[in-house]
């Protein structure tokens, strides 16, 4: 068994690239001394310490695909966040959809019938600090499922190992509902209930002598999954949980320490989502988590790459992060 995982690609298509350029121009101007300083700081932080230069993300993505081809995997899993989420509303934004569709189409061409695609938080929609608007949208979920073929839940079996993919944004739905459209909330709740039932049924049906490799974009979902009795009972059978979202593996160690700080609930959407998600970080380790880095890491190639998973003849499961350089 050979698996290759790529996550948090964040490639910008032509439409998002133009929006990003306009946004960066706006962030570098500002009015008033304090506002100008704050906006320039945000501009530099986005450029240098998180998403790096958008012009180079595609090069990192293409190089990552080359490295995956050389590995000859049985399955390739894309662990969410394909585009830049320029509008803060996920795939319902035309430019974001264009970016994500380009990524997914190319991967299917290179790895036909060997790809699984996951939802990331930015694919469904998430409030944007930069443009100060956005949130989850049902249209984004529907576009991803119906047009791009991203499944909220999927399962494959390779001998005695079950590969299970889940939609972390449905599990952590309460974190995002304050920014949802009011008329969509009942349908969101229905979809969450349906998704949780799929996940718990899969674990209930798991034979006691077989193992799971779980794929989950946002680690915040793990603290809610462990609350389900059937998952608590089966946690020893979870060989690995492959995470995305964090862009680089060292942040997993950092967030382990953050919950020890005094609890608080910020009113600002992004701060609130992070605070609520981190409260259960001490439970994540039940899932044997490992972070798949973004191909470009967190800027300037810091810990960027892809993740390889291999089963040895003596039934051990080995993981290896492979650095991507351009």
Outline where the language-model segments fall.
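Active-site-proximal loop/helix segment associated with metal-binding centers of metalloenzymes
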Residues: 13-47, 163-210
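Beta-strand-turn-beta hairpins that frame and shape the catalytic cleft
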Residues: 1-4, 13-17, 154-168, 207-211, ...
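Binuclear metal-dependent phosphoesterase catalytic core
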Residues: 249-326
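Active-site environment of divalent metal-dependent phosphoester hydrolases
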Residues: 10-15, 83-87, 117-129, 171-175, ...
